[in-house]
């Protein structure tokens, strides 16, 4: 289940925002009890893709990025 501040990737290109498949972003808002999400994406130069903040992404469009903690 996806939740606030999860790191996700977009499964397919979004031509409306210019976000490409595989781009990592962070969930910044959960809508309708998890039926949709606002995701903040950045381009390869580190610039925020503003249009992504006005787009609702469904869980089917997103893939959670699993991270492993390494303790030293």
Task: List the model feature ranges, each with a label.
Residues 3-65, 70-71:
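Basic/aromatic-rich interaction segments and small domains that mediate binding to polyanionic partners
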């Amino acid at each position: 289940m996806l939740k606030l501040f999860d790191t996700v990737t977009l499964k397919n290109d979004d031509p409306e925002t210019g976000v490409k498949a595989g781009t990592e972003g962070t969930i910044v808002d959960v809508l309708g009890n998890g039926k949709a999400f606002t995701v903040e994406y950045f381009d390869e130069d580190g610039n925020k893709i503003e249009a992504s903040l006005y787009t609702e992404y469904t869980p089917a469009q997103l893939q959670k990025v699993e991270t492993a903690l390494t303790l030293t």
